[in-house]
């Protein structure tokens, strides 16, 4: 299944994987998964984290390695993001709930994920998604960005 991913997608997933893999040992533990999910405003229980890991832990060693992570991402993409997942993601970014993602809100979430971005990089990300040019990202623009192939 992971063989249907483009090189660009694999590179993006590698970057995402390293955000989860806090200690850089090449595997994601339940603790690391929990840290990232909490930084995104989720509050999973230990059991939920274990279930999430077990779902993709092909070799049964209790952690997720990069090939397992790729399989999980490929699977998720095949079920292409349901509207509800996209709306949920939008809410994570839209901290003040005004229906727009500002540069400050984007920077806040990315920083929580451990991504240190310059102001230019954040502005560039907003510009790429900002179709109507108002300097922020509304829900429609967010959907376009998330579903762009």
Swiss-Prot record:
Modified positions (N6-acetyllysine) in chain numbering: 22, 95
Signal peptide: none
Protein's cellular compartments: Cytoplasm, Cytoskeleton, Spindle; Cytoplasm, Cytoskeleton, Spindle pole; Cytoplasm, Cytoskeleton, Microtubule organizing center, Centrosome; Cell projection, Cilium, Flagellum
Keyword Calcium appears in the UniProt entry: yes
Organism, as annotated: Homo sapiens
Reported effect, residue 90 to L: In LQT14; significantly decreased of KCNN2 calcium-activated potassium channel activity; not changed KCNN2 expression; not changed KCNN2 location at membrane; decreased thermal stability in presence of calcium ions; decreased interaction with RYR2
Top-level taxon of the source organism: Eukaryota
Protein name (Swiss-Prot/TrEMBL): Calmodulin-1
Activity regulation, per record: (Microbial infection) Inactivated by S.flexneri OspC1 and OspC3 proteins, which specifically bind the apo-form of calmodulin, thereby preventing calcium-binding and activity.
Record Gene3D superfamilies: EF-hand
N6,N6,N6-trimethyllysine modifications at: 116
Cross-link Glycyl lysine isopeptide (Lys-Gly) (interchain with G-Cter in SUMO2), sequence positions: 22
Residue(s) carrying Phosphotyrosine: 100, 139
Crosslink (Glycyl lysine isopeptide (Lys-Gly) (interchain with G-Cter in ubiquitin)) position: 22
Chain residues that bind Ca(2+) 3: 94, 96, 98, 100, 105
PTM: Ubiquitination results in a strongly decreased activity.
A GO cellular component entry from the record: centrosome
Domains as described in the record: The N-terminal and C-terminal lobes of CALM bind to the C-terminus of KCNQ1 in a clamp-like conformation. Binding of CALM C-terminus to KCNQ1 is calcium-independent but is essential for assembly of the structure. Binding of CALM N-terminus to KCNQ1 is calcium-dependent and regulates electrophysiological activity of the channel. The C-lobe interacts with KCNN4 channels in a calcium-independent manner, whereas the N-lobe interacts with the S4-S5 linker of KCNN4 in a calcium-dependent manner playing a role as calcium sensor and gating the channel.
Amino acids binding Ca(2+) 1: 21, 23, 25, 27, 32
């Amino acid at each position: 299944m992971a063989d249907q991913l483009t090189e660009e997608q694999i590179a993006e997933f590698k970057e995402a994987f390293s955000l989860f893999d806090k200690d850089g040992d090449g595997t994601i533990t339940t603790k690391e998964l929990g840290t990232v999910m909490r930084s995104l405003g989720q509050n999973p229980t230990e059991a939920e984290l274990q279930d999430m890991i077990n779902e993709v832990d092909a070799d049964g060693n209790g952690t997720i390695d990069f090939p397992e992570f790729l399989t999980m991402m490929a699977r998720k993409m095949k079920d292409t993001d349901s509207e509800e997942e996209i709306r949920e993601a939008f809410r994570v970014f839209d901290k003040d709930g005004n229906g727009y993602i500002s540069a400050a809100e984007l920077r806040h979430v990315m920083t929580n994920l451990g991504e240190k971005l310059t102001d230019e990089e954040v502005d560039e990300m907003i510009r790429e998604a900002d179709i109507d040019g108002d300097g922020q990202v509304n829900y429609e623009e967010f959907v376009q960005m998330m579903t762009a192939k």
